[in-house]
């Protein structure tokens, strides 16, 4: 069967939607120094983080970037909107479009690799980007877009349309109730908006071995008060990656329209993304052996060339805020996404230490339709000496999944070798799940909840206490892929409390603590399970956290101690994937960012984590370390402006992971690894009109470290890290 016969046409829709809504005024607060002070300090450059005058806590405008603009000390807290990290009892940090450009980051994994609290992981026998936040699985599909669940493209998200990648660490059902897998945290994406200064940027890029791409970024504001804005991003990139025969192609088109009025603010986003992977390395199936194999050569491809995945997404979102009266705002958002994934997957199943394996086959045809929305009212008032910031809201998400598959029989799978891989013909399909060309509904998920929260402040908001609760209802239904009849269902609802406190003994220090709970649908069973594709049920988790945050103007950071308890999923003796145990993660997180010396910028973080299993089958693995979770993970990033050459900057980043285990018995140990990335960029003005050109060059994994990067949560697949990779880009702003 050829690909064309089973892949329906999805033409690129070049549809520009016009959104006409009311007008905005922006308030600007100018800070002026008198002439005497300027003369006194004329040879002293003062660098500190200053807030954007239009930023309002709880709204949709992103938290101002810190210093050089690569990091933001805050981000979106779901329905509570954008918040400064110093004012909330939660751990959150944002990475900006400037970091994305400067590091030539093309996907979300490239961005979150700057944070030790997030561990990138490859998907179950495919090319998906998934993550572990605080040691707990987070599906890339469950990222939010401006706080709205179910809107981001499936599996791999391109960064070209993004202004921010924001990482919230910890259970977050109060804030992001409609999301699915974010027990250990959440990743929120903020789309680009037109700025007051017009944006016109064209770029070309190259990534080894032969990936070449082009991009266009246009933004402009219109109207007497710049109240209308439009931002357009276009990207196309294709070629072979650093691993031989690993071919990839990306096409992205997005438009963001917004309106800033005196009382009303609104935005509309529409995007199209298609990702194609051909012949790239997938995970190695180690479920049939009791050891970790030695590594193949760094650029050797042990996957068959006929393996592929095509993923196409279309998504749209409308948001609106309206100031009812002073300090009281109504907000609403609504979005929808259509996704189609079709692929032929082949993960080599290892047989022995010599590298002999079998090349199986799994064809998947999947359609996902998602609708999501939220609405609410937030406001401020005072009762005596106590200030109140309240929020009442409702959010909901529905998802309809149509999945069909067909796969080969183990006895028919041809023999290959992961060290000396020969190309073989794909084996014939022997078992089938549903009508492959016209899948029936295989699953439906509905999640909805009411939010009530109040942040009380005393002593001029030196002491802040946040109390909130969400009544969350989750319904999960699985259907037989052949008959369409319901096979099983899960239904649960409960009130989930969240409370936290922030105390600021000094203006630059915040001490905080929180207790949060989450209720959400669990992940789907991997393709190695007998119940492949089915939801594992509903997860109820709890977190306790204490910490400290600091912002000294030129340098900031945080220290957190936390504990999370949740049900754990693994394969039972019948190879069914389900919630068969419990996991407790205790850890310490440290973050540091800023510019301690002029021209020297740092972004460093470290996580110490103990992920312990309990309530395992017959208690055999109680007390063992959870699969794929290193006890220590650290990132050290630095930039240095090289003088006297204006615009020349050297960059470096060191990532280190401690050892981890690939099975619950802790008998399969994955060694620790360290990677080093180096780069340089040069920004120069080309003419008197100040047209700018920026040249960036970098090498990821400079030492060509050959390492296993981790294992999936079930312990089925082992993933190899990326080899040495060269990348160059040129951007021209006009």
Model-derived regions: residue spans:
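Conserved C-terminal beta-signal and adjacent last beta-strands/turns
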Residues: 20, 390, 513, 544, ...
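Acidic, small-polar-rich N-terminal luminal/periplasmic segments of exported/outer-membrane proteins
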Residues: 43-197, 546
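Outer-membrane beta-barrel translocator/receptor signature
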Residues: 160-163, 174-253, 259-265, 314, ...
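Acidic/polar loop-and-plug regions of large Gram-negative outer-membrane beta-barrel proteins
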Residues: 237-241, 254-323, 336-368, 411-439, ...
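Structural signature of Gram-negative outer-membrane beta-barrels, strongest in the C-terminal barrel
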Residues: 258, 368-370, 387-391, 395-399, ...
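Surface-exposed extracellular loop regions of Gram-negative outer-membrane beta-barrel proteins
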Residues: 276-289, 398-403, 498-545, 550, ...
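Membrane-embedded beta-barrel scaffold of Gram-negative outer-membrane proteins
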Residues: 319-323, 327-335, 339-345, 512, ...
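Gram-negative outer-membrane beta-barrel transporters
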Residues: 460, 563-565, 579-664, 731-733
């Amino acid at each position: 069967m050829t690909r064309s016969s089973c892949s329906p046409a999805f033409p690129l829709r070049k549809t520009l939607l016009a959104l006409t809504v009311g007008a905005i005024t922006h308030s600007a607060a100018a800070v002026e120094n008198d002439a005497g002070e300027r003369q006194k300090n004329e040879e002293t450059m003062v660098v500190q983080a200053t807030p954007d005058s239009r930023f309002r806590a709880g709204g949709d405008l992103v938290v101002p970037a810190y210093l050089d603009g690569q990091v933001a000390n805050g981000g979106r807290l779901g329905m509570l909107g954008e918040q400064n990290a110093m004012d909330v009892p939660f751990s959150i940090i944002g990475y900006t479009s400037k970091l994305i450009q400067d590091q030539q980051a093309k996907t979300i994994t490239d961005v979150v690799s700057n944070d030790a609290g997030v561990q990138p992981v490859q998907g179950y026998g495919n090319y998906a980007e998934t993550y572990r936040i605080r040691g707990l699985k987070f599906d890339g599909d469950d990222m939010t877009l401006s706080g709205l669940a179910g809107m981001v493209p499936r599996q791999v998200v391109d960064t070209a349309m993004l202004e921010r990648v924001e990482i919230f660490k910890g259970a977050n059902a109060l804030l992001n109730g409609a999301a699915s897998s974010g027990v250990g945290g959440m990743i929120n994406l903020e789309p680009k908006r037109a700025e007051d200064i017009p944006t016109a940027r064209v770029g070309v890029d190259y990534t080894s071995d032969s990936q070449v791409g082009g991009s266009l970024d246009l933004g402009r504001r219109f109207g007497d008060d710049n109240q209308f804005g439009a931002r357009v991003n276009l990207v196309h990139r294709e070629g072979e990656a650093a691993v031989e025969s690993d071919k990839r192609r990306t096409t992205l088109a997005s438009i963001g329209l917004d309106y800033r009025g005196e009382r009303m603010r609104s935005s509309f986003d529409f995007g199209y993304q298609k990702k194609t992977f051909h012949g790239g390395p997938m995970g190695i199936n180690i479920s049939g052996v009791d050891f970790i194999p030695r590594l193949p050569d760094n650029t050797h491809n042990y996957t068959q060339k006929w393996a592929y995945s095509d993923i196409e997404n279309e998504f749209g979102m409308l948001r609106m805020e309206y100031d009812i009266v002073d300090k009281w705002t109504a907000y609403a958002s609504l979005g929808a996404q259509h996704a189609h994934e079709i692929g032929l997957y082949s993960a080599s199943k290892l047989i022995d230490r010599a590298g002999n394996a079998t090349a199986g086959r799994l064809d998947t045809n999947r359609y996902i339709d998602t609708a999501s929305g939220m609405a609410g009212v937030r406001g401020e008032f005072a009762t005596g000496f106590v200030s109140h910031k309240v929020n009442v809201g409702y959010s909901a998400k529905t998802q309809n999944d149509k999945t069909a598959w067909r796969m080969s029989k183990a006895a028919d799978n041809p023999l290959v070798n992961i060290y000396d891989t020969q190309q073989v013909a794909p084996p014939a399909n022997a078992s089938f799940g549903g009508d492959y060309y016209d899948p029936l509904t295989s699953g439906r998920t509905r999640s909805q909840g009411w939010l009530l929260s109040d942040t009380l402040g005393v002593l001029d908001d030196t002491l802040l206490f946040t109390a909130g609760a969400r009544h969350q209802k989750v319904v999960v239904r699985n259907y037989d892929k052949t008959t369409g009849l319901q096979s099983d269902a899960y239904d649960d609802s409960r009130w989930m409390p969240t409370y936290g406190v922030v105390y600021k003994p000094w203006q630059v220090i915040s001490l905080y603590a929180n207790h949060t709970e989450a209720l959400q649908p669990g992940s789907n069973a991997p393709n190695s399970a007998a119940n492949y594709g089915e939801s594992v049920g509903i997860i109820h988790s709890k977190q306790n956290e204490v910490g400290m945050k600091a912002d000294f103007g030129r340098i900031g950071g945080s220290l957190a101690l936390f504990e999370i308890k949740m049900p754990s999923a693994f394969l039972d003796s019948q190879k069914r994937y389900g919630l068969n145990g419990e996991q407790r993660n205790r850890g310490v997180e440290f973050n540091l960012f800023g510019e301690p010396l002029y021209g020297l910028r740092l972004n460093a973080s470290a996580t110490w984590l103990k992920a312990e299993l309990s309530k395992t089958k017959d208690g055999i693995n109680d007390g063992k370390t959870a699969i794929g979770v290193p006890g220590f993970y650290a990132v050290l990033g630095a930039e240095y402006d090289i003088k006297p050459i204006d615009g020349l900057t050297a960059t470096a980043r060191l990532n280190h992971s401690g050892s981890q285990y690939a099975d619950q018995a802790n008998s399969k140990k994955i060694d620790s690894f360290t990677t080093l990335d180096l780069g340089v960029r040069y920004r120069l003005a080309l003419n008197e009109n100040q047209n700018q050109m920026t040249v960036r060059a970098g090498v990821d994994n400079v030492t060509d470290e050959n390492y296993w990067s981790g294992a999936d949560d079930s312990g089925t697949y082992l993933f190899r890290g990326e080899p040495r990779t060269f990348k160059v880009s040129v951007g021209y702003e006009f």
